[in-house]
Design a protein with these regions (language model features):
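Acidic/polar-rich alpha-helix caps and helix-coil junctions
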Residues: 3, 11-196
Length: 196
């Protein structure tokens, strides 16, 4: 298990096959219209109460993940694997937990040379940092996020915010020009860098 998990979530209580209460971390995927019959883990309220006061605008681990991505893409001549591992370790230090021995020997956490792996760990590192996870997903398409009938936009992820109503009213002429240029003012309209 990732040692950051108890910081991010609390264990849920469910019944096992014998009717006994069992506490464990239970994730619920997004995109489902019907509520599951299991009780999922909730965010850790203690962390939620203190995280906004103690999180920097850009953490050291985020800088290292950016550098790991640049190295993975061949933009800088550095070791992407070393940067990835340093980024994960820096994030664990940020949360006050130790990197478990053998953490990078696990196939689910070992650097495999892909942007996807970097972005999965960056997603965890950006927990409690406003909308940054969403921006990173929109920019890269990672991590894989399931969609389905429970997502308000159906099978499409939201890519952008709609123009505010006040702007639509107060600057109508330019708003209409912008909408015409983009194709629509819908939250599923892809942004220019997503259309390439």
């Amino acid at each position: 298990n990732d040692p950051r998990l108890p910081i991010f979530a609390v264990k849920a209580t469910n019944k096992d096959e014998n009717g006994k209460d069992v506490k464990d971390y239970v994730g619920l995927q997004s995109g489902y219209a019907d509520m599951p019959t299991i009780n999922g883990s909730a965010p850790n309220a203690t962390t939620l109460a203190t995280a906004p006061q103690s999180i920097a605008l850009m953490t050291y681990s985020e800088v290292l993940f950016i550098k790991a991505e640049l190295a993975q893409r061949g933009i800088i001549q550095q070791d992407a694997a070393a940067l990835y591992e340093a980024a994960v370790e820096a994030n664990m230090q940020q949360w006050g937990v130790e990197l478990p021995a053998g953490y990078f020997e696990n196939p689910k956490t070992a650097y495999d040379g892909t942007l996807k792996r970097i972005m999965e760990q960056k997603f965890y590192a950006l927990f409690f940092i406003d909308f940054q996870q969403w921006f990173e997903y929109n920019r890269t398409g990672y991590p894989d996020v399931p969609t389905g009938p429970g997502v308000a936009t159906g099978d499409a992820m939201p890519y952008r915010y709609k123009y505010p109503a006040i702007l639509q009213r107060m600057n109508r002429e330019n708003y209409l020009k912008a909408v015409e240029s983009m194709g629509s003012d819908d939250i599923t309209t892809k942004l220019i860098w997503q259309k390439r």
